[in-house]
Amino acid sequence: IIEKMFEYGKNNGIFSEKAKFVHVNCSEYANNPELITANLFGYKRGAFTGADNDNPGLIKVADGGMLFLDEVHCLKPECQEKLFLFMDKGNYHVLGDSENEYHSNVFLAFATTENPKEVLLKTLLRRIPIQMEIPSLSKRSEMEKSNIIVRFLENEAKHIHKEIRIGNVVYAALLNNEYEGNIGELKNVIQETCMN
């Protein structure tokens, strides 16, 4: 949904044609919170062990476009606080360069499967001007799930340039499975099913 919003923005002049959409799954960094901060805000060579080159950071890479932080509830409060400060004016510091202030004009989008009021700092939550609640698959009707499955199958057919047909057993399994990872997991299951 977020990427479609970005594409809509590009097609309607909100973002330039060169604007980038950068997706970060914060849960991948849950066991290494320092790494997500370094990758978001960037770092200078020698800032820490293993920093052999400068890294501009994903905030800079997405400058002029959109940075989507998925599973944002996995961010530690220290990183959320840095995001809050960045959202205030678009300025930030790169790890290993506290003297210079950097700027990025990036649209931030967040998603969480948790209750945002319980997992996000109030300072960060107040800065999010538009909040949408998208129901999980478990809360959707069978018709809605069916429409989502059909849409993903059509998209996958276009992607692999083949007609895709599934039997009733596979369809029932797709429809009735409990997807903890929600729509992203359903999409992955459909992609894997179509590859086999």
Cite the ranges covered by each PLM segment.
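C-terminal helical "lid" of AAA+/P-loop NTPase domains
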Residues: A172-L175, G184-N196
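Short conserved motifs of the RecA-like P-loop NTPase core
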Residues: H161-Y179
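NAD(P)-dependent short-chain dehydrogenase/reductase
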Residues: F41, S146-H159
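Short gly/ser/thr-rich secondary-structure transition/capping motifs
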Residues: A47-D52, K89-V94
